[in-house]
Each structure stands twice: as structure tokens, then as C-alpha cells.
């Protein structure tokens, strides 16, 4: 009877452990290969001959280490010998063999390494003994399976995500869109992974099904996939007795993944080839981070921007989950790993932890958290095994010992497709970890059919009661990366969603979209011992948002446990968008020791600083909240914004344009003024503007070149979507907002580098026009200048002002 692939893999794992230390060709090669045959159920010692006498190409006598006529030739060497020489030696034996005896596979081996050559194709693959279980399909003919053609497989990476994206685009262009398209892509993703990881048996069943059971022009691929999905959703005992045997070999998957009947997709030759091309990749090596990249590469750019999606590297995800729970769990394990009773209780604790991401996207945070929890569980099992009476046993059935499962993980995602990706991603990483355990303990196992499922809800997190997904009393940790959208970038629907959460909070109109998750998390965690941590744009700890958000967090009795101060957050997707972020961990409990992660370089690693308290500005200081103030606390001049052109560039000139205009129209020189935006002031560059405040309409019309520019301003303003700008097209010779003082003033750029010790300031006379990228202090004195350039004022500014990315944003409030 032919062994199934799971049994073969289990035997291969045990074989790898048994022969891990073998090295001597003379004494150990023969028992090594006899044991190797038993992996495939071959116990008859006479199928192959050891030390077969053969004549080499030059007529000299040689000895083939192992020969199975028509099937296999092996040249074996002691550990560490040159395999290239061994290959040449093995090929040299073939010249004088009868054609009927020529082997299908030639294998050279030194105990630690294998090199397998497929003689029909000439292709070769190398692997190490410890990875034999991954390559058993190459030896399928030994167990009665057809020869598995060797393919060079590239690891799945961002290119694979983009390849799936092209398939998505082709299907969409053919008219296959919406929900059906999204579900189809998720199913294909699962099938590609299952084909390379032992879920589908034999390996590459999915690829073979497409190649052998569908037409090359793709005309019946849609119906073929529909039939396959139906089989994957039907238990083996309930399948039709006359089912195609190639379909019947696919395992029942369950998990409701293949439950819904989809409309049939129409494929072309190119689309079928694209799917087969994807089959050629090594999906067993998929990184959990790929799912965010996959989603991002196939989403519409506009939709991605509107959702504020940021798909993140594992390094950045670990910045959040390590201080939230992982470091503490690892420390506890190190304390108790020598005590079996305590290990048992700790393992029980791991099984009971729950994780909730209320803005889970494609599930990156949940996937990495699950993987790390399973890695820790593996350490627990290894430590327990080493303390048990079974220490030294090569194969251990651990299937009943694995307790951590995907049903401990919960999420909310507003879009259907990423919600589906998140669920499948957790199943896939679960299978990856099961393979890790299989290698560790020498016995293959897989959790198929899918019994447990993650609790991912497709819903609007700002409108759903989170307790419907996971009751707060059952939640251990809340975590994630909610969308970052400043007030000016929020859609009307998003503003309404946020208003539903913050309607009773004074001043909430200034809040970033992400603040809705902070406030809902605080309400959710109130009165519990659970903890939360979110990645956020750094603006929530700067400027006018601070008093509003953190005042509410104080009212809800939240305490900050740890914080990463501003750093540059990058993602794994195309374009690698960089955002300046913070991470804030908080909860209802107030731990005695807290941690602040500081960054000398926002692109570099942090260093941890122990703190007694962490305030709203993420420093170890009293939690004083500075509210927005419109009226100064003492008698000082008002700080106002500079004048705003809203001209499309037509009223502004560089030096060459100024000279050309004066040459063409000398009378225009009277109306040209020096113009200072923030860039011109900071970098000492020259710019000019047409300042036609006192120029009559008649005089403007007498200057045709000036009139062309005025007309361009008019057209630009009329084309605007802003109603006030359209109205102001009627005064197109003027800046839209005129705030120029009639006296000298102190110019203050709104944005300047965080690397400066102080905000750059400068005195200007009233003839120099100040642009709206600056603020102005009219009638300023040296006293005002001294205060604003003082170390005290700039220290205050650095910790409390708003920022653009990491640059200082200086305002008049």
C-alpha cells in the first residue's frame, strides 16, 4: 500500500534526527540508505544493489555505492567531501549501463547534504538532511508516485504579491469584480500555500490539477476552480462515488473558506499562465508581512489613501508587541523553565490569552503576535520534554500538546477583502508553526480540516460595540495600527464616524481619525487589567490635540505604560511610505515602572529609558495639558499668519521672471515687492510678487503682461472646488488673504527643522511681503525677539508644539 505524504514526511523527520551525526561512508552508508528506503515504505532489501561493479567510460572498473535499475543511482561520500566530484563520478557510471537500466534519479550525498539530479530534465536541487521532509516529493517514485519534476522555486516576496495583483487586474478587466473577485483571490492564495506545505497531498496537486485538468486557453479554468472549491468544502465521506480521483485526493478544508458558491470567472490563456506562474513560487516560505503588501499592491491607490492604510515591517510590529506582552511572557518563561508544574501552568496561561486588533487590516499585527506566541509555546514544549522521562526520544506526538490556536485572536476590519485575508493569514501562519513543531519533534501534523477560526469581523470599528467581537472581561490585549487621517483629510463619512465617538468631548474637531480608537479602547478597558497599544501619527502627542485627547484619556483613568517617541515608520509595500509615528501603550492599571523608547536617529533603533511616569507629551514629567489659547496671558502684540496668494503661482516671480516683466513692462516695477515664504527666509533665497493692493483696475489694464497673470489667477480660482476661492476670482489682482502689516514685523516660519536649537526668526520692514507659510509679530521689539529665541521658550516649544512629520510647527495658539 502506498504511504500518504504526511506519513512519509513524519518518517523523513525521524530519519533526519536519527542520522544527524553520521559521517563515515564505509561503516554507515549502507544502513543509512536502508533506513532511507523505509521512509517510503520499502522494506525489501533486494530492490537495490550496494557496491555494484561497473565499467567506467574509459574502461576502468568502478563501484556504484547503490543502484536500483531504472530508478535510482547513489554515490555516497563521507561527511564534508566534495559533492561536485561525486556528481562527475556518478554520471561516469551511466555510460556503460543498458538503456533499460538508466536511472530516473541520480543522488549524491555526504550524510549532511543531498544533491538530486532529474535525468529527464537535467535539473538539479540541493538541500540539507534537516530539510529532507520538504523534498520527499522528489523521491515520490520510490513510494509509487510519479516522478516529481524538479523546479527552481523562488521564495515568495513582494514580486509575488505584485503577480497576484496583475491577476486581480486581469480578472477585474474581464468584468469579474467586487465581492466575488475578492473571495476568489483569497481562495487562490490559500491553495497556493496549501500546495507547498503538505495541506494538499501529494504536493503540487493544485498545480497539477490546473495543468492536467484545464484547457491551455483557460476556457474551462473558471468552472474547474469552481468544482475544486466545491470538493474542498465537502467531507470525504459525503463526496460523490464517481468523483474524479485527481479531485478526490484534495483534503476537506472546512473553516467556511470554500462554502460560498461564486459566479464563474472567465480566464484567458495569459491569465491561466499567470496562475501557473504563481504556482511555481515557494509559498511555504511566505512571510506574514506579505499579506499587507499583497493587499496594498492590488488596491486602488485612491482607496488606500482614503483609508489611511500603512502596511508595516515585522521590525516595527515587534516594537509594539514586545513591550505590550512578549517581553513579559519571555521573562516569566525564563524564571520557571526548570519546573514542570510551573511550565504546565504557564502553558495553560498561554492558551487563555486573547488578542484584539480593532483596525486589523490584513492582520499583520495579529499574525506576528500569533507566530511569536507559538514560538514561545514551542520553547515551553521543548523545556518540558527535556525535563520529562521521554528526553532523548527522537519522535514525539505533540499534536495533543499544542494549545495556542487562532481562535484566541480577534479583529475588526471595515473592508471585506482585507478581513478575509486576515483570517486566512492566521490559518497559514498556524500551519507554518505546525511544520516548525513537526521538525522539532520529528512527527508531522497539520490541523486540517480547519476546526478553529479567528474572530475577524467585517464592520466599522467606530460604530460597532467592541464587546460584540470580544467581551472586555475576556480580552487580554488590544493592539494595532488604526488609520492616520488628520482633520483636513477625513471624508464626510469618516468625520461622522469620529463624531459619533467624540461628540461629547469639547474641542474634538481638531482630533486625528486615530483618536477614535484610543477613546473607544479606553472605554473598553476601563475597570479591567487588560492593556492596549497603538501605533499613531506623532501629532496626537503634539500641539492642540494633546489637551483634547489626553484630557479624555485621563478622565477615563488611563495610564501610559510605555511609549516610543517619534520615529520613522516604514512599510513593506511598493513605495515604502514613511510616516512619523509614536507608539503608546496604556491601560487602567498604573505600573510602578514604565519605559520610554528614545530615538537619537528617527530611522535608527531606540534605546529604552526607565520612567516613573509618562505624560501626554511622552516624557517623564507631570501630566500638565496645555490647552489651545487665543488670548495672550499678558499684553503682547498678536501673532498673525502672513498673506495668502492662492494664485497658482501667477502673482509670484523668480528673479529672471521679474527682470523679464520689467523689461517688457517698465511700469510694472512699481508694483513688484520682495516676497518671503518660509523657504526663502530660512534658505536666504530671493523671490518676488506682484503687490497690486493700491493699483487701480485701470492701471492694471494698462499693463498687458500683468493682465495675463491676473487673468490666470482668475481662471485658477474659478476652477477651484472651494466656494470662497471661486468668489475671490472677482478680485484676482490681489492675494486672497491680505494681512501685511504697515509697520516693521518679526517673521516666524511656521515649519522649521527639528535639528535647530531654536526657531529661526527675523525682523522685516513692511515693504517685504510675508507669505502664509510664516507667522508675523507686528511692532515687535528686541524684548519679544529675546523671549522667543530664549532656551526656555524653545525647550517649551520642542515638547508642546505641533509638528509636520518631525519638523517644528509654530502656531499662534
Located regions from the model:
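A short, conserved, highly charged catalytic patch centered on acidic carboxylates
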Residues: 1-105, 119-122, 147, 733
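Preference for the N-terminal adenyl/adenosyl cofactor-binding alpha/beta module
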Residues: 2-18, 129-372, 408, 412-421, ...
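Signature of N6-adenine DNA methyltransferases within the class I
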Residues: 22, 56-62, 79, 83, ...
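Metal-dependent nuclease catalytic cores in nucleic-acid-processing enzymes
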Residues: 33-38, 89-106, 394-395, 425, ...
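Flexible phosphate/Mg2+-sensing switch loops adjacent to catalytic phosphate-binding sites
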Residues: 47-50, 204-207, 332-351, 373-407, ...
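C-terminal substrate/ligand-recognition segments
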Residues: 310-327, 355-356, 366, 741-753, ...
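Short, ligand-facing micro-motifs at secondary-structure edges
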Residues: 565, 752-768, 786, 795-808
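Amphipathic alpha-helical
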Residues: 702-734
Amino acid at each position: 500500500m502506498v504511504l500518504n505524504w504526511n506519513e512519509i514526511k513524519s518518517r523523513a523527520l525521524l530519519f533526519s534526527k536519527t542520522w544527524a551525526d553520521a559521517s563515515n561512508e564505509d561503516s554507515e552508508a549502507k544502513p543509512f540508505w536502508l533506513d532511507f528506503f523505509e521512509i517510503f515504505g520499502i522494506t525489501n532489501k533486494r530492490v537495490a544493489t550496494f557496491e555494484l561493479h561497473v565499467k567506467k567510460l574509459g574502461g576502468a572498473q568502478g563501484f556504484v555505492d547503490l543502484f536500483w535499475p531504472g530508478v535510482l543511482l547513489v554515490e555516497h561520500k563521507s561527511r564534508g567531501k566534495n559533492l561536485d566530484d561525486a556528481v562527475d563520478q556518478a554520471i561516469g557510471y551511466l555510460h556503460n549501463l543498458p538503456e533499460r537500466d538508466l536511472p530516473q534519479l541520480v543522488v549524491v550525498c555526504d550524510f549532511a547534504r543531498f544533491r538530486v539530479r532529474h535525468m529527464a530534465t537535467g535539473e538539479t536541487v540541493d538541500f540539507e538532511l534537516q530539510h529532507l521532509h520538504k523534498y520527499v516529493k522528489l523521491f515520490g517514485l520510490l513510494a509509487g508516485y510519479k516522478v516529481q519534476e524538479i523546479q527552481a522555486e523562488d521564495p515568495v516576496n513582494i514580486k509575488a504579491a505584485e503577480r497576484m495583483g496583475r491577476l486581480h487586474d486581469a480578472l477585474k478587466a474581464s468584468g469579474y469584480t467586487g465581492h466575488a473577485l475578492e473571495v476568489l483571490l483569497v481562495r487562490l492564495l490559500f491553495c497556493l500555500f496549501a500546495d507547498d506545505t503538505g495541506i494538499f497531498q501529494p504536493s503540487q496537486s493544485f498545480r497539477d490539477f490546473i495543468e492536467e485538468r484545464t484547457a491551455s486557453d483557460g476556457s474551462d479554468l473558471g468552472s474547474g476552480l469552481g468544482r475544486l472549491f466545491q470538493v474542498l468544502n465537502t467531507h470525504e465521506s459525503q463526496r460523490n462515488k464517481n468523483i474524479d480521483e485527481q479531485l478526490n485526493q484534495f483534503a476537506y478544508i472546512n473553516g467556511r473558506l470554500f462554502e460560498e458558491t461564486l459566479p464563474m470567472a472567465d480566464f484567458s490563456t495569459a491569465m491561466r499562465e499567470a496562475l501557473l506562474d504563481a504556482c511555481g513560487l515557494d509559498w511555504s516560505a511566505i512571510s506574514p508581512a506579505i499579506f499587507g503588501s499583497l493587499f496594498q499592491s492590488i488596491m486602488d491607490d485612491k482607496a488606500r489613501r482614503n483609508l489611511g492604510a500603512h502596511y508595516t515591517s515585522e521590525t516595527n510590529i515587534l516594537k509594539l508587541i514586545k513591550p505590550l506582552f512578549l517581553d513579559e511572557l519571555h521573562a516569566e518563561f525564563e524564571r520557571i523553565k526548570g519546573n514542570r508544574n510551573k511550565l504546565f501552568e504557564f502553558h495553560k496561561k498561554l492558551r487563555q490569552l486573547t488578542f484584539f486588533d480593532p483596525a486589523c487590516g490584513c492582520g499583520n499585527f495579529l499574525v506576528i503576535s500569533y507566530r511569536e506566541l507559538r514560538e514561545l509555546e514551542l520553547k515551553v514544549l521543548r523545556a518540558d520534554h527535556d525535563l520529562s522521562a521521554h528526553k532523548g526520544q527522537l519522535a514525539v506526538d505533540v499534536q495533543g500538546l499544542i494549545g495556542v490556536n487562532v481562535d484566541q485572536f480577534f479583529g475588526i476590519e471595515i473592508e471585506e477583502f482585507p478581513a478575509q485575508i486576515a483570517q486566512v493569514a492566521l490559518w497559514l501562519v498556524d500551519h507554518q508553526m505546525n511544520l516548525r513543531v513537526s521538525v522539532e519533534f520529528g512527527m508531522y501534523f497539520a490541523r486540517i480540516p480547519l476546526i478553529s477560526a479567528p474572530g475577524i469581523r467585517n464592520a466599522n470599528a467606530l460604530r460597532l460595540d467592541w464587546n460584540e467581537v470580544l467581551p472586555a472581561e475576556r480580552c487580554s490585549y488590544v493592539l494595532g495600527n488604526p488609520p492616520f487621517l488628520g482633520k483636513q483629510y477625513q471624508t464626510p463619512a469618516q468625520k461622522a464616524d469620529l463624531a459619533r465617538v467624540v461628540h461629547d468631548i469639547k474641542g474634538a474637531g481638531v482630533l486625528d481619525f486615530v483618536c477614535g480608537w484610543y477613546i473607544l479602547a479606553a472605554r473598553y478597558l476601563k475597570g479591567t487589567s487588560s492593556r492596549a497599544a497603538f501605533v499613531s501619527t506623532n501629532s496626537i502627542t503634539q500641539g492642540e490635540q494633546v489637551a483634547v485627547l489626553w484630557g479624555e484619556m485621563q478622565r477615563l483613568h488611563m495610564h501610559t505604560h510605555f511609549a516610543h517617541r517619534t520615529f520613522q515608520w516604514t512599510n513593506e509595500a511598493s513605495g515604502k511610505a514613511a510616516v512619523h509615528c509614536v507608539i503608546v501603550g496604556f491601560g487602567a492599571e498604573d505600573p510602578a515602572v514604565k519605559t520610554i523608547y528614545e530615538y537619537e536617529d528617527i530611522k535608527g533603533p531606540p534605546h529604552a529609558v526607565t520612567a516613573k511616569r509618562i505624560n501626554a507629551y511622552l516624557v517623564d514629567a507631570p501630566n500638565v495639558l496645555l490647552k489651545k489659547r487665543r488670548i495672550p496671558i499678558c499684553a503682547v502684540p498678536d501673532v498673525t499668519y502672513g498673506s495668502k496668494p492662492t494664485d497658482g503661482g501667477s502673482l509670484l516671480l523668480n528673479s529672471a521672471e521679474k527682470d523679464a516683466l520689467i523689461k517688457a513692462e517698465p511700469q510694472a516695477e512699481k508694483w513688484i515687492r520682495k516676497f518671503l515664504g518660509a523657504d526663502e527666509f530660512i534658505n536666504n533665497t530671493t523671490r518676488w510678487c506682484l503687490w497690486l493692493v493700491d493699483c487701480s483696475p485701470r492701471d492694471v489694464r494698462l499693463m498687458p503682461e500683468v493682465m495675463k497673470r491676473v487673468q490666470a489667477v482668475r481662471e485658477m480660482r474659478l476652477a477651484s472646488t472651494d466656494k470662497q476661492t471661486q468668489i475671490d476670482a472677482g478680485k484676482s489682482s490681489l492675494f486672497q488673504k491680505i494681512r501685511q502689516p504697515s509697520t516693521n514685523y518679526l517673521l516666524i516660519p511656521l515649519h522649521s527643522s527639528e535639528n535647530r536649537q531654536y526657531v529661526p526668526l527675523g525682523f522685516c520692514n513692511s515693504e517685504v511681503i510675508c507669505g502664509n507659510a510664516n507667522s508675523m509679530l507686528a511692532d515687535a521689539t528686541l524684548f519679544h525677539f529675546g523671549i522667543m529665541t530664549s532656551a526656555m521658550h524653545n525647550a517649551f516649544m520642542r515638547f508642546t508644539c505641533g509638528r509636520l512629520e518631525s519638523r517644528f510647527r509654530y502656531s499662534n495658539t
